[in-house]
UniProtKB/Swiss-Prot annotation:
Name the record gives this protein: Large ribosomal subunit protein eL34
Pfam families, A to Z: Ribosomal_L34e
Organism expressing this protein natively: Pyrococcus abyssi (strain GE5 / Orsay)
GN (gene name): rpl34e
GO biological process: translation
Organism classification: Archaea, Methanobacteriati, Methanobacteriota, Thermococci, Thermococcales
Keywords associated with the record: Ribonucleoprotein, Ribosomal protein
Length: 91
């Protein structure tokens, strides 16, 4: 095993070959799931992928198509309400 593969930053995947041997394939681990910028809840609609995999996806598959995609729906609604109320008070 190469010294670089001794680190646990590489995921070990055991693969059975057609000859019947079991060999280890080393893969980079997936990044953690995206979280809301305000409350920290996990975000739906954003895939867990390494930058190489994310680059291959179309823009619509990388994030939700709604205002404030970096926020969870609950926080997004709260921010939008605050903005509208601020505009009403100002104007």
């Amino acid at each position: 095993m190469k010294p670089m593969y001794r680190s646990r930053s590489w995921r070990r995947k055991y693969v059975r070959t057609p000859g019947g041997r079991v060999v280890i394939h080393f893969e980079r681990r997936k990044p953690k799931i995206a979280h809301c910028a305000i409350c920290g809840r996990p975000l739906n609609g954003i895939p867990r992928g390494r930058p190489v995999e994310m680059r291959k996806l179309p823009k619509t598959k990388k994030r939700p198509e709604r205002p404030y995609p970096h926020l969870c729906p609950k926080c997004m609604r709260r921010v939008m309400k605050e903005q509208v109320r601020a505009q009403i008070m100002k104007g």
